[in-house]
Amino acid sequence: MRKFADMKLFALLLFPFLVQAQTHNTAKDLLNEVYEHTLALETQHIAFTNTIGAPSNGGMKERSSKGELFAMGEKVRVKTDAFEFLSDGSKAYLIYPEDEEIETTASDEETSLSPADILKNYQSGYSYKMAGKTIGNNGTTIQYVALRPVASEEVKEILIGIDVKSLLLEIYTQYGTNGVKTVFSVDSYEINVPLDKEMFNINSS
């Protein structure tokens, strides 16, 4: 049986240096600001690319896939080629169409794939550091925050890229202690657009 813990790879969709204490607080404050902004959104539609790189024969072997995320309040639906994830706020479902298999669990911040809940997961248990800026493809400034877990056997570092103008997630990169690199990059991000409530119903799958 596949486990919901595997889905935390989504858990997602990364922040000039001051003294250590100052950069820690500045980076965490930015994450909190993005969290509050995301929480206030009525709806979200994100098209993303997920790329996983694993060490292979002295190099990195990568595979990429496309997906979409729809969110309305606490309700979330994620569609990919391999699976669908659905949360109605009380229960979470992991659906594998090819296997005609559905897994069910209680919905909480640990299983949710909503952008707000993913960001909330990083409010404690990590050290934070501002990690430079880049210019995105559309000319926007992307501020990065590096997070290191206080205690983790699986995650070495997480890099979160934030569009400083829109305060929306732009890219999420997770570096595993086993050398695996997982990247979720946002291809398009629409907010407060009309969404059909029925799409968050398990019976619509």
Language-model features: locations:
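Short, exposed beta-strand/loop patches in secreted or surface proteins that constitute
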Residues: 37, 66-70, 84-85, 129-136
